[in-house]
């Protein structure tokens, strides 16, 4: 993202404060890949809120479910997440903008990046148990939104690993679809950033969290233990392989993730050997 792009995001934040009648409380905070910006703010009644700005090409977003993800997620109940208060849309030439006013979560992010930025960070089993409870609740929601398809699973595994095994998934549920440590808070759990949620394979969320944490063996072991009924079945291993393939492809082309490449390759090889043995 260029400085000009960042300035446009900042200008949009200021523009949105006038619409919502709020006052920014801190400098704008960009997400890890610079696709959105947010800031803590105060309403005229003195309530603390979070203002988030996102944008996209107007033609591209017409059939892109990520554009409506946060708004659609406002229907989800009994899940620890931020709540949508209001939103505001506008268009500037061929770019569509959206400002989302969300409830403020007064917790720390587990990490400022999908991979751990603090080598001493430890997740507790209690926290992971709470995460699982929330994912179970989410899994039971009915939605027309699609996060991952069978075709996605088949193509990604075949292209990345060229393994000849049946990759059919039969257990499809509603998932978050982008579960990593930059979208989770600690010590109290909240699940953030709901752009891509929808139908997907059971176990994908913890599998993706595991893949992004591949170089932290303590975190990996705890995720596998808490989610063993989802991850250690045959289908669970297929889902793990798919998530590992996704992150491995990122690691090969983005230096920010390069340290994950070796541990993911080791994990993937072990899972492939297990799948071939049982095939």
Feature locations, PLM:
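Short Lys/Arg-enriched alpha/beta "domain-start" segment
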Residues: 1-33
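A conserved alpha-helical element in kinase catalytic cores
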Residues: 6-19, 50-98, 119-129, 133
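Active-site beta-strand-loop-beta-strand hairpin of nuclease catalytic cores
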Residues: 42-49, 185-190
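A glycine-centered beta->alpha junction motif in the catalytic cores
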Residues: 56-57, 90-124, 140-144, 241-258
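Conserved kinase catalytic-core helix
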Residues: 69-81, 101-149, 177, 270-274
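Hydrophobic, aromatic-enriched interface-forming segments
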Residues: 126-188
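Active-site Asp-x-Gly
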Residues: 174, 185-229
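A conserved long alpha-helix in the C-terminal portion of kinase-like catalytic domains
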Residues: 210-279
């Amino acid at each position: 993202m260029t400085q000009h792009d960042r300035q446009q995001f900042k200008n949009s934040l200021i523009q949105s404060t006038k619409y919502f009648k709020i006052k920014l409380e801190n400098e704008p905070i960009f997400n890890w890949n610079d696709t959105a910006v947010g800031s803590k703010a105060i309403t005229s009644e003195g309530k603390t809120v979070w203002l988030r700005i996102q944008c996209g090409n107007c033609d591209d977003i017409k059939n892109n479910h990520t554009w409506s993800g946060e708004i659609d997620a406002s229907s989800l109940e009994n899940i620890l997440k931020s709540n949508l208060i209001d939103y505001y849309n506008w268009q500037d030439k061929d770019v569509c903008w959206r400002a989302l006013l969300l409830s403020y979560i007064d917790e720390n992010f587990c990490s400022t990046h999908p991979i751990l930025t603090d080598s001493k960070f430890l997740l507790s089993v209690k926290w992971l148990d709470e995460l699982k409870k929330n994912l179970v609740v989410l899994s039971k929601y009915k939605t027309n939104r699609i996060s991952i398809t069978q075709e996605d699973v088949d193509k990604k595994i075949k292209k990345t690993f060229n393994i000849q095994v049946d990759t059919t998934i039969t257990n499809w549920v509603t998932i978050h679809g982008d579960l990593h440590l930059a979208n989770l808070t600690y010590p109290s759990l909240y699940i953030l950033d709901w752009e891509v949620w929808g139908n997907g394979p059971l176990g994908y969320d913890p599998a993706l969290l595991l893949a992004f944490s591949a170089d932290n063996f303590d975190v990996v072991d705890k995720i596998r233990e808490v989610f063993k009924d989802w991850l250690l079945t045959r289908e669970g291993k297929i889902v793990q392989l798919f998530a590992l393939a996704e992150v491995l492809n990122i690691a090969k082309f983005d230096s920010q993730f390069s340290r994950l490449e070796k541990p993911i390759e080791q994990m993937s090889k072990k899972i492939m050997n297990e799948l071939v043995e049982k095939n």
